[in-house]
């Protein structure tokens, strides 16, 4: 989505009393790095190159740009499936300046890291999601943000594909459909790695998985 279209979407949602949930990655950076991998390596079969093509800077820049557009429109937004500390810092800066910004993250960014992309290619492709899994240090920042109530929801970005569909990227990882399942596993993962490990409370888990999403999307108190 180009900036003009985003401005128009946010403006219309403001008129309707709605709110946008926006995936934030700079596609120009991604496309340039995909070309660079092809040029330097002569192919894109090595899945371990995948996270390099979608760096944390691509997320942080897109978050920053979205928030500036939202400020021009004077409307709140939701940054969905936040995966990096860099993107989180952009949101904190906007909040400090008075903007209303909500954050969603997902279990995959809380419990897995980019080491999955060093597995054998057939297995590694199963973990190709967008944004990609990140370095482990980002998990600590996201968990702390959840503990402090600075992240509002934990969703899944559920988008499942079969093994056969993932094989579309066997010769070129950029052809792999990005996504993985998560809706069924989300409560168990957050309970085990969040509540049982004392990173968040059981009450917070209920707020992030149920109450806050219902409030953000105007389903409360019928849901949540």
Predicted segments — roles?
Residues 1-154:
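Histidine/acidic residue-rich metal-binding segments in metalloenzymes
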